């Protein structure tokens, strides 16, 4: 049941996000600018979900992308969008949880 929910959110099977970051993955925080300013994963770039589709030029397709947001819902939507455009992408879920995984 839990894995089914994770799949629905675009989180899929567990991957080593820490290793992906070490290997050069880009963290994209899709929360609003105000949310991002209130705290974010070190090194993450902020492209709010509402404008992500218009800002794909900021992301290189040869780089792995990890999306994050507050809870995993918006980052799941971002993952779906980016995947449909040919990006290699993983849903990191909520930013605080992702930050803990990267320590």
Please provide the spans of the model-predicted regions.
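Rhodanese-like catalytic fold shared by cysteine-dependent sulfurtransferases
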Residues: 2-16, 23-25, 33-64, 73-103
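Short, surface-exposed ligand- or partner-binding patches at beta-edge/loop junctions that are enriched
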Residues: 68
């Amino acid at each position: 049941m839990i894995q089914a929910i994770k799949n629905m959110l675009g989180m899929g099977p567990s991957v080593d996000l820490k290793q992906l970051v070490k290997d050069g993955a880009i963290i994209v925080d899709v929360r609003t600018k105000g949310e991002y300013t209130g705290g974010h994963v070190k090194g993450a770039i902020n492209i709010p979900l509402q404008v992500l589709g218009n800002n794909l030029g900021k992301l290189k397709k040869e780089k792995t992308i990890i999306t994050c947001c507050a809870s995993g819902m918006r980052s799941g939507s971002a993952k779906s969008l980016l995947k449909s455009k040919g990006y290699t992408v993983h849903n990191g879920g909520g930013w605080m949880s992702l930050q803990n995984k990267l320590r």
